[in-house]
Amino acid sequence: MKIFLPVLVMLILCSMCLLTEGQVSTNKKCSNTSQCYKTCEKVVGVAAGKCMNGKCICYP
């Protein structure tokens, strides 16, 4: 039981690192998600992304 907490913390930290590596930030300004599709298709090859804080974020 003593090892459970450290293993759980390590699992959470590793999961956070893997999830943040999966997104590509661009400098393309946007006001809605549909403006990001063409940019994401050029950057990562897939039209999968969204507009966050006025910039396109793409997901490969």
Curated annotation (Swiss-Prot):
Disulfide-bond pairs as recorded: 30-51, 36-56, 40-58
Taxon lineage: Eukaryota, Metazoa, Ecdysozoa, Arthropoda, Chelicerata
Keyword annotations of the record: Disulfide bond, Ion channel impairing toxin, Neurotoxin, Potassium channel impairing toxin, Secreted, Signal, Toxin
Stored SUPFAM superfamilies: Scorpion toxin-like (SSF57095)
Gene3D superfamilies: Knottin, scorpion toxin-like
Similarity comment: family membership: Belongs to the short scorpion toxin superfamily. Potassium channel inhibitor family. Alpha-KTx 15 subfamily.
Main subcellular localisation: secreted
Job description of the protein: Blocker of A-type voltage-gated potassium channels of cerebellar granular cells. May also inhibit Kv4/KCND when coexpressed with DPP6 or DPP10. The occlusion of the outer entry of the K(+) conducting pore is partially reversible and affects both open and closed channels. It shares the same target in rat brain than BmTX3 (AC Q8I0L5) and AmmTX3 (AC P60208). Has been shown to weakly inhibit TRPV1 channels.
Protein name, UniProt field: Potassium channel toxin alpha-KTx 15.9
